[in-house]
Amino acid sequence: MLNRGYAYTTIISGKDNGQTLLSHLASLYSHSTAQAWQQRLNDGEVALNGVTASGSEPVFAGQSLVWNRPPWIEPESPRHFEVLFEDPHLLAVNKPSGMPTLPGGGFMENTLLRLVQKQTPNANPVHRLGRGTSGIVLFAKTTEAAAKLSANWNTPRIQKIYRALAQGIARHDAYEILTPIGLVPHPLIGSVWAANPSGKPSKSLAKVISRTTSTQHLR
């Protein structure tokens, strides 16, 4: 799918004062080399304070930086979702596996956010699920709902339950998993959150729901 392109807008912070624009771009968007950024600058894709930039300009706090990325072909992904619940404040949808929740990693229009907002422009996700995960995503339709959900999201009032099909034979019926979670390299999208010894502390409780000869269904 060829999208319509996108204007990535940021404001220069004080810690970046005096850098050349080219150095700042290569640091801010590290997925591309300085050489690639210079080509984009030469093509007129970057503006600093509304003026097309060359890359040699020094940057200063408070300046507006815009990268007008031309249209690009997005990776394929599912484009259908199921509405599970809706009222004036909340929207709950079932996200299929393979669909990103938010733009990123080459995805812009082929995301749950864009598809939901085509039907409900005032809906904004309260949380996200990874691209490979299917399940319920909650959207707030009002600022009041967003504030209340965000305030309660990391409290015992909100419980997250995941189900997974795991390979191998589990010796026990219940597990406590304390493996730290952090960013690890990914060959296609740069990095993903996964088991990482230097990551943040995490705690998951897993219970075997059913078994086969080579797998188990966990919750």
Task: Give residue spans per PLM region.
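RNA pseudouridine synthases
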Residues: M1-R219
